[in-house]
């Protein structure tokens, strides 16, 4: 069972208890470049006031025990923290979890050293996300409305009116984003797996995603929805500058360097090249599904670029590579083509007389000792290039959010952030 649906069930339970919600449920995405399936890269934080914390803890632990799909590899983690403020150590842990690999041992040691009340099943990998979620500080945020199916519909094909989603996006954009792929005429709000989510709408406010949900047309009877405050769409994982002398596998971040090898298109349509950062050369890969391979192909030696992505571990057949998630061109070199000179009398290209012997016009005999230079116009520009929206990750900051920052959001209890149908 997915983390957000389990949170939805817990919130429905808490609504019936004598508790007070003091913030929206928070959905925090951590480092997406960690390879294992249950990797703690999505975690939910619930902040409440209660007079009976021990009872609430027992009930939530029971929810985790009853509904977690441990047989299929789930490793849920649960952390409880009671105080008026969050210690700096939690914030530091959370920042690291955004971009690096944090081991289960590190998480368990953190819990032990700080005497934290916790619970986990499986190998405890979920504790990484649980600690990180408590310590996470929003510097920007979006919202996602997740609408859930009834249990009888789990695993069945989702049937949604495509035109209603397309129209919804045209009306609500840019207050909502990445709902419909116009280029491929494809709905983006519905997942493809058997999970309980029917659709998810992302946007800038609770009002915008709730309004958008009223425009989505489907005949399926749904269970309800919950709105999460999230770091999705903020590129949180790419704010860390990678250290070229210590590029650890699965870390995320950015590098600034100069292209030092000609881009090569390999099998599958993926493009690889290297950049020079200080005295180190870093191999970079731009993949076909991002649809920015043509941009990568047009890079030349000396171009200064800013890249964000994750470090793929070296293997027997492949070397270590930075998997590119964005490509920002800072400076373009002039593309100079050296050619045989043109005879000023005959207006024809001269021919080479041999190595270091200059050039001669085969018609009139005029001579020249140097080649002519011709500047070829560049096909790419100094700008940021992002993948096609079909290849966006949860954390990808789309074009329309580049200058957008939602720093403050008062918890408005009058808004319908939870709705049980």
Please annotate each region the language model reported.
Residues 60-65, 70-244:
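Long, hydrophobic alpha/beta structural blocks
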Residues 300, 372-421:
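Long, charge-rich boundary regions
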